[in-house]
Amino acid sequence: MGRMDYLAMKTDDVDTVALVNSDMEELKVAAKKLFSDVSKLGGLGFGVSFLKFLASFAAIYLLILDRTNWKTKMLTSLLIPYIFLSLPSVIFNFLSGDVGKWIAFVAVVLRLFFPKHFPDWLEMPGSLILLLVVSPHFLAHHIRGTWIGTVISLFIGCYLLQEHIRASGGFRNSFTQPRGVSNTLGIILLLVYPVWALIVRVM
């Protein structure tokens, strides 16, 4: 009887060890899967942030081009709301704070009392700073960074692209004319960010 009890206890110990080992293996598999998913999501998030920076600078680049001899017929004023919606949070918070308020104040004073000293090329940047400073909380925190703002950015990019292609005389000319290539590439960069952001959001 004692031998049977001993064998039963030994069998129970073996079963317990096997069960613990099995649980440990499952934990290892779960940890590896969690690490893989976190790495994947982190990479996707980094991609969105990087493309957001790229899109914002592309929009600023197009604004600068519009004030040079490379001026196009497209409605570049739409780049202002695009920059507002796609500007990275770090830069947005900096420009919508006291720094932006001082810049906006100086711009308004110059425009009102010294119009001759207020160059035309400052109209767009001044409008952007004013928009960043006076935008309501709802627009700044509930439209920016959400799928609504991303969709609006996508529509702006698509509209600017089709307007640019039409002004260039066709799709081929937009890539072959010296003045058209730089604008075309800039607008394509405007489209990459919202498209990728929507894909990541769906995933």
UniProtKB/Swiss-Prot annotation:
Mapped to this chain, the residue ranges on the Extracellular side of the membrane are 1-43, 96-98, 142-144, 201-203
Could you list this entry's UniProt keywords, alphabetically sorted. Answer: Cell membrane, Membrane, Transmembrane, Transmembrane helix
The residues exposed to the Cytoplasmic compartment are 65-74, 120, 166-179
Its localization reads: Cell membrane
Q: What kind of membrane protein is this, topologically?
A: Multi-pass membrane protein
Q: Which GO terms describe its cellular component?
A: plant-type vacuole; plasma membrane
Chain segments annotated as transmembrane: 44-64, 75-95, 99-119, 121-141, 145-165, 180-200
Q: Which family, according to the similarity comment? A: Belongs to the Cold-regulated 413 protein family.
**Which protein are we looking at?**
Cold-regulated 413 plasma membrane protein 2
Q: Species name for this entry?
A: Arabidopsis thaliana (Mouse-ear cress)
